[in-house]
Amino acid sequence: MKIENKKILHTDILIIGGGTAGCYAALTIREKSDYSIIIAEKANIKRSGCLAAGVNAINAYIVKGRKPEDYVDYAKKDADGIVREDLLMTMSEGLNRVTDKMEKLGLVILKDENGEYVARGNRNIKINGENMKPILAEAVSKLTDCTVINRINITDYIVENNTIKGAYGFSIEDATAYEIRAKKVLCATGGAAGLYRPNNPGFSRHKMWYPPFNTGAGYAMGIRSGAEMTTFEMRFIALRCKDTIAPTGTIAQGVGAKQVNSLGEVYETKYGLTTSERVYGTVMENLEGRGPCYLRTEGISPQQDESLRKAYLNMAPSQTLKWVEAGKNPSEQNVEIEGTEPYIVGGHTASGYWVNTERETTIHGLYAAGDVAGGCPQKYVTGAMVEGEIAAIDMVSKLDADTSDGSPDTSAFDEKKALEAKASEYDHFLTERPQMFTTEAIEEAMQKVMDNYAGGISTHYQFNGKQLALAKEKINHLIELTGDLYASDMHELMFIYELKERLTVCLSVIAHLGARKETRWHSFAENLDYPGKSDDWMKYVNSRYENGQLHMIYRELGGREARYEHND
C-alpha cells in the first residue's frame, strides 16, 4: 500500500483535537471573529476525547458561597505548591461562565426545589451529562467556515524559526496525506495513556481510567519541535474500583464512604487526603499486610443502593453489573479499590506544555489547552473549556493585530515538496517488508519497561536512579526497533505513530522523574533515592528537546496575579 492522495489545505486557525477544549475553542473563535477554522480529529467529534461517554457531575465549579480563589487554593494544596497560580486563577474565573454556556446549549443541570444547582461537595454540581459531547459537537457543526475533518491522524507540526506554520497528518480511512497550513494552531489532543502496563491484561487492557486512544500525540509533537514542557514527573494515578476501574468519587462523595482496610480501620486520615496521598495510603496498607482496601459501603440505605446502581449504570456500567453478578448490593459488601497505572494528564496534574497566561506555548503561534497544557491541575471538563476559550480569544486578538497582507510565506512549490517528503515517510511504513516485531509487541515491551523501571504498578509506583537509567536505555532501544515496523493499512499506520508518540513521551517522563530529587507527591513520583520532601525543590522542573537531547530547565514559582510571558 502507498499514499495515493496528497492534500494541502489553508486556514486561519487549525485546532488539533476535537475534544472538549478544541470544540469550545472553535465556538469562541466564531463568536469573536470570522476567521476560518479547521478541526482535525482522530476519531469523530461527536463522541471523542475524555468526554465521549459523558459525565454525571461538573467537577470544577464555583458553588454558592465560594470564590475562584478558593478553587486555586484547593488545586495548589493538592499539588503541594507546584502549580502556575496565574493559570489556575484565569481558569477558575471562567468555570461558571462556560457552565452557563453549556446549559444554554442544552446541558441538563440538576436543580433543587428553589431552582439552585444541586451541589456535590465544595466544587461540584450534578448534571445529566451523558450527551455533553454530542451537545458540543452539534454546536460546532452549525458554525460557518468551520471545517471538521474526522478520522485524520496529525503526526507532526510544521515549525519554521520557532514559529508554527501548520501540521502534517494522514487519513485513517483512505491513503491520503495532509498538509494543513495555518496562521495559528491550537493543540488540544489530550494526555497520554498506555505508557505503563495497565491493571487488566490481554483483551481487557483498555479497561482503564483514561482514554486509551489519547496517546500523547500533542506532547510528542511539541517535544520533537523543541517546545518547553513542564512537570512530567507529576504523574497521575487514579484511585478506582478494583477490576472495573470505575470512579470512586461517586461513592466517596455520594454516600460519604471512607477508605478502610481489611481490618475495618479507616486509614485515609493516616496518610492524608490529597489525591496522591489517597493512592499512597492504599498502596502502603496493602504492603504492610492490611489489604485489601475498600470504600466502606456496608450499611448504607436501600435508597443509597439504588442511587449508586443508577449512577454507575450511566457512567461505568461494569460496576453495576459486578454488583448484579455478585448478587449483593453495595450495602451488603464494601467496594474494593486499587490504583491505576500512571498517566500523564495536565487536566488532573500540572504536566504538559509550558504556556504563558494566554496559553501560548514557547513556539510562537502554537497554543495548548486542556489535558495537554501544563501548570494548571484540576481542570476537569469546565477547566478545559475555559482554556480553549482563553487560547481562542488570544489567537483572534493576535490575528486582528497582524498587519501583514495575509499572503502565504511559503511558496506552493515548497509546500508541495514538504508534503512529498512527509508522504515518503508514511510510505516507508506502508511498504511491506519482513519484520521481527509487531507494533503491539513493542508496545507491550514499552509498558513492561516503564512498569518495572519507571515506577509502575508492579513496583508500587516506586523507582530509583539506576532503574530510570535502565528504563531510558531500554526505551531508546525500542525506538530504534520502530523503524522496521510495517503497516498493511492506514489504521495500522496510526498504531505505529501512536507507539512512536508514547515512546517519545516515555523518555520525557523518565527524565523528569530523575530530575526532581525529592518525593513531593507519594506514588505520583516516589523517588527511593530521595524519599523526603525539600524546600529546595519548590520550583518547576521543565525540559526542552534540542539537538537530540532533553535539556532540563528549572524555573522559580510564579505568583497568582502576575501575567506570565515567555522571555527566554
Listing of model-derived features with the role each one plays in the protein:
Residues 187-246, 381-394:
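Glycine-rich loop(s) and the adjacent beta-strand/alpha-helix scaffold that form part
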Residues 13-39:
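N-terminal Rossmann-like FAD-binding beta1-loop-alpha1 element of flavoenzymes
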Residues 8-11, 174-184, 362:
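Core beta-strand elements of the Rossmann-like FAD/NAD(P) dinucleotide-binding domain
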Residues 59-91:
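Glycine-rich active-site loop/strand segments that organize a redox cofactor
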Residues 104-155, 231-380, 385, 452-568:
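Mobile, glycine/GP-rich and aromatic-enriched active-site lid/loop segments adjacent to catalytic centers
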Residues 31-53:
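Glycine-rich FAD pyrophosphate-binding loop
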Residues 400-488:
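Long, amphipathic alpha-helical stalk/connector segments used for oligomerization, subunit docking
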Residues 129-156, 160-179, 219, 225:
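Helical element adjacent to the flavin cofactor pocket in flavoenzyme catalytic cores
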